[in-house]
Amino acid sequence: MTMSRSSRSSVLALALATGSLVAAGPCDIYSSGGTPCIAAHSTTRALYSSYNGPLYQVQRASDGTTTTITPLSAGGVADASAQDAFCENTTCLITIIYDQSGNGNDLTQAPPGGFNGPDVGGYDNLAGAIGAPVTLNGKKAYGVFVSPGTGYRNNEAIGTATGDEPEGMYAVLDGTHYNDGCCFDYGNAETSSLDTGNGHMEAIYYGTNTAWGYGAGNGPWIMADLENGLFSGQSSDYNAGDPSISYRFVTAILKGGPNLWALRGGNAASGSLSTYYNGIRPTDASGYNPMSKEGAIILGIGGDNSVSAQGTFYEGAMTDGYPDDATENSVQADIVAAKYATTSLISGPALTVGDTVSLKVTTSGYDTRYIAHTGSTINTQVVSSSSSSTLKQQASWTVRTGLASTAAANGCVSFESVDTPGSYIRHSNFALLLNANDGTKLFSEDATFCPQDSFNDDGTNSIRSWNYPTRYWRHYENVLYVASNGGVNTFDAATAFTDDVSWVVADGFA
């Protein structure tokens, strides 16, 4: 039986009145609308009112063990404190994003396909567990922060739409975290991880890629990745009805059936949905009517494992059948009632904007060395009160407001050279460099870092990359990198990682 619009509104009103997330979740609403979820993924909350099973799994680097994160209560917010306790004094990766629908459509580390990922064997990277903290109704949770090279997939999903079968999907994303790479997607893709032709995908895309279609303004845009094209309307090119997005939290909705599809979106923190397109399949390119969907599920990557995009995912689901607008409107109201909000990205002793600091190594045998620079190379050098004024300046850094504004708003900072004003520490190919600020979005993100508690007891802080949150400032052979705790690069070696990424932040020499 289909729940009426008034009944769905009553269910939502009850949730608002009780201050609870459990009166009806998005997948309860989809089910009541006659289009049940066949996959439901979220690291932030349960998507069914009665769900109290696993949301996601994390693995810690210190001993390789895993733990499962569940809601605090049935239908509730994820138990972030369990993750924090498990991952204390080490790093953690999100290894599994569980399907809450009961179909077992879990998302795991994406395998190689048309493109290889950067991890061992061509697999994609896994997301760091702490890169995307938020609150829901005041309770802390973590999203999935996708850096370029990160991706999740299930090529053997059950119950997903294939061929020209109807389906719907939604996702809640970070509207400020994007790039123009291909392709930050969530949805239906090829089961082979290869590009098998036009119309073999149907996935939500978010970003500023203009290689195919694009919308009004400069983006970012919600679009549909239908394979070999990003679409926001009947045309495969420009579509004025698809607006640029400026919301911090974004609801993105895509649905498709035989010669019919729609694209909708809105502010996930307030208000209602807008319809950006509702009409027939693209007519200026072949292969999209009928569609040839294959039924795999992807997150953070393209159907052929394209891995150059970035974005943040909080929750999403895919349905059996083509949801009506009223059902989606009620899902949006439920998302708004969850009250997504930002929270601090930092921990440990605060670094004060405007202060000049020097950072001392804590690794035994190297602890007379400080972070300095020689030209554009960031390295460690032995520095003391008797060192030359030139060296003291090279080893001193002014703490600035983070150049990436979305991260700066939550505590992250940038480090300007004292002896080369206008130049900042940034990473490029994971090496730390001193470069002049060129004003680009990429530079701002590469030069923004989030201080946190030191991993060892000798330091005050570890310094984490904002846009690659699995990576920290590390000295390796006296040169500085942003390094992960184990990985494919020599400077990612797990041995001595804890000490090598822990620093004493002290008053600057100059």
Swiss-Prot record:
Localization annotation: Secreted
Biological process terms in GO annotation: arabinan catabolic process; arabinose metabolic process; L-arabinose metabolic process; pectin catabolic process; xylan catabolic process
Catalyzed reaction equations: Hydrolysis of terminal non-reducing alpha-L-arabinofuranoside residues in alpha-L-arabinosides
E.C. no: 3.2.1.55
Entries under Pfam families matching the protein: AbfB (PF05270), ArabFuran-catal (PF09206)
Residue positions the entry lists as glycosylated: 89
Residues the UniProt record annotates as site (Cis-peptide bond): 182-183
Spans annotated as Catalytic: 25-342
Keyword flag Cell membrane: no
Metabolic or biological pathway, per its Swiss-Prot or TrEMBL entry: Glycan metabolism; L-arabinan degradation
Protein name (database record): Alpha-L-arabinofuranosidase B
Main location: secreted
